Amino acid sequence: MLSLFDPGTGRAEPLVPGHRGELRILSRGGPPNLAGLCDLLLPDLIRRTTEWHRLRVASAWAETGAGTETGAGVKNGSGAAFRQAASALNLRPPDTDDLGSAADVCTGGDGGPPADGRWTRSGPVTFPADLGGTGPDPLAGLHDRGLDPLALRLVLLGRRYRDPFTVTWPALAAAEAELASWRGLVADWANLPSRPLSAAHRGRIAAAFDDDLDTPAALTVLRDLAADAAVPPGARFETFADADRLFGLDLVRDVGRDG
């Protein structure tokens, strides 16, 4: 089960689904820009980790400002570019506009904890001035340089979500190269005899996510697995494909592609 930092106790506590065994996530909107977009990674990771344990999830994005917030932008035509950017980062859209009852966990926002449920938020992220562009597309700078938006997701997964963080162009370029390397390996492994996934590596990855979303530790396991010649290629393929349900990096994208 996922344990998430609780500001009330100062330690990670199990995140227990409430209503009928369903975890309800409310994401308070930020500005419809790059920072607001990246804030949505936290609820996405909470959702993925909860679903990993075969639990149901319902999510909603809240409006916390007069039409200038993420939730508002997503709900009207002016939010089309924002929705496309969220999709490019593999951030799942909300299930509903109204959860119908109190949320079990609320993320983001500047107004402090909600009346009900756990409250948590990401640490501030600083970006290069030319990364977000000046138009409605928060990922314009990445597109201008021909970079995969998921390179940004990988960079953000490399830090603990509560820590302040600075994104740099060199880090994005390195993430782009690592993604290409992993996808190439996965495509090669897919052509070799299948083997059962590595339960040990799978367990370590899941344990890292359960431990207050320790994504840096989970990435370390993935990197170790990629280089572990003792694990058959078919097992590495199955483990990478399975773990990508948590990482959301499209690691099997190049399987079956020529060249």
Predicted regions and their residues:
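Structural preference for alpha-helix termini/caps and helix-kink/transition segments
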Residues: 1-35, 42, 52-259
